[in-house]
């Protein structure tokens, strides 16, 4: 969203087409999130995290190399798929093996990452007038993170002993199973939590997608400044 005011003119599409990309990413995220339980039991939280980070890194690099709207839409599919599983897998892993304060730190790190992205994009637009460079810079960071996660894979099995081995794929068939959605819907308070999370996600995604465009087209702020200002929202929720 932070780069869209600079992107849409190059693609020759209406400003509203950002919504198409967002919906494709959201659809992929929902699908991979719903499948995350089964995938994590089969592969383990560490491998799911590594694959997801690598997938999003490749997709971001693809964004940075693309100059076609429809190609961006195509690349948005693996980006969404990679973004969904990692959230569910990491949250579940931390909830099982760490204290609640560690969950807060996990979400804090997400907020920092989400805040840094628009700032990097703003700098790329300001210095190079090139949104593509911003995506490439972010993809390079993701690639480094991929290597870090891959190197740390042996550590995932050390936390929690046998309990962790089950969550990381070993002996999963004996100790864990994927919970069907119909069972999840029977959990007391689950529907209220889903509704609250839906409302939060709607606000977060709408603001993240359109904040930069609003600042450019309504407030007349330069694109590079608006891209950086979009980070303030994520800083606020962090």
For the regions a protein language model found, what residue spans apply to each?
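Small-residue (Gly/Pro/Ala) motifs that create kinks and tight helix-helix packing interfaces
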Residues: 4, 36, 113-126, 212
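Extracytoplasmic gate region of multi-pass secondary transporters
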Residues: 1-4, 188-231, 235-238
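Residue-level signature of mid-helix packing/kink "hotspots" within the transmembrane helices
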Residues: 25-34, 115, 234-238
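Cytoplasmic helix-loop-helix junction between adjacent transmembrane helices
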Residues: 75-111
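Juxtamembrane intracellular "pre-TM" segments in multi-pass secondary transporters
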Residues: 156, 160-194
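Conserved MFS/SLC helix-loop-helix module at the cytosolic interface between two early adjacent transmembrane helices
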Residues: 31-70
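Symmetry-related core transmembrane helices of the 12-TM Major Facilitator Superfamily/SLC fold
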Residues: 133-154
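Short hydrophobic/alpha-helical segments at membrane-entry points of transmembrane helices
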Residues: 68-76, 192-193
